[in-house]
Amino acid sequence: GSSGLIPMGRT
């Protein structure tokens, strides 16, 4: 997952 408002891969 990436850091940010929407951690893609951790949805």
Curated annotation (Swiss-Prot):
The keyword Secreted applies. One of its GO terms (biological process) is neuropeptide signaling pathway. The modification Threonine amide is found at T11. Its main location: secreted. It is found in: Secreted. It holds the Pfam family Periviscerokin. The keyword ATP-binding does not apply. Expressed in abdominal perisympathetic organs and abdominal ganglia. Keywords: Amidation, Neuropeptide, Secreted. GO terms for cellular component: extracellular region. InterPro entries: Periviscerokinin. Mediates visceral muscle contractile activity (myotropic activity). Belongs to the periviscerokinin family. This is Periviscerokinin-1. It comes from Panchlora viridis (Cockroach). The lineage of its organism: Eukaryota, Metazoa, Ecdysozoa, Arthropoda, Hexapoda.
